[in-house]
UniProtKB/Swiss-Prot annotation:
Keywords: Ribonucleoprotein, Ribosomal protein. InterPro entries: Ribosomal_eL30, Ribosomal_eL30-like, Ribosomal_eL30-like_sf, Ribosomal_eL30_CS, Ribosomal_eL8/eL30/eS12/Gad45. One of its GO terms (molecular function) is structural constituent of ribosome. One of its GO terms (cellular component) is cytosolic large ribosomal subunit. Belongs to the eukaryotic ribosomal protein eL30 family. PANTHER family: RIBOSOMAL PROTEIN L30. The lineage of its organism: Archaea, Thermoproteota, Thermoprotei, Sulfolobales, Sulfolobaceae. One of its GO terms (biological process) is translation. It holds the Pfam family Ribosomal_L7Ae. This is Large ribosomal subunit protein eL30. PROSITE patterns: RIBOSOMAL_L30E_1, RIBOSOMAL_L30E_2. It comes from the Archaea.
Length: 108
């Protein structure tokens, strides 16, 4: 039996709510572009994101005072969680919609 923490369940539920009611952008290169324009509220990166891209995202997010959350799973895990048949390395949150994902992540 796989143990799933309560925090993980709430994160996954809020991520699904975010995808239904909010506005997000997938992809590291697009994330960097939108971070530079300060049009992002938060960025979620997969733990397996390539090092140079992760450093760029962290650097520009720090300059723009945008929080970055590192998802513990791989890009494939994040893609599956988002209901996509492909890997997702980065999710940029433009509008959180009805989800409380920003609050949940800030609590961590």
């Amino acid at each position: 039996m796989i143990k799933v923490s309560e925090q993980q369940v709430s994160f996954e539920g809020e991520l699904k709510s975010l995808l239904k009611t909010g506005k997000v952008i997938f992809g590291a290169k697009r994330a960097i572009k939108y971070i530079k324009l300060s049009k992002v509220k938060m960025v979620i990166v997969a733990s397996t994101l390539r090092g140079d891209l992760k450093q760029d995202i962290m650097h520009y997010a720090k300059l723009s005072n945008i929080p970055v959350y590192e998802y513990k799973g791989s890009g494939w895990d994040l893609g599956t969680l988002c209901g996509k048949p492909f890997m997702i390395s980065t999710i940029s949150i433009i509008d959180e919609g009805d989800s409380k994902i920003l609050d949940i992540i800030k609590e961590r």
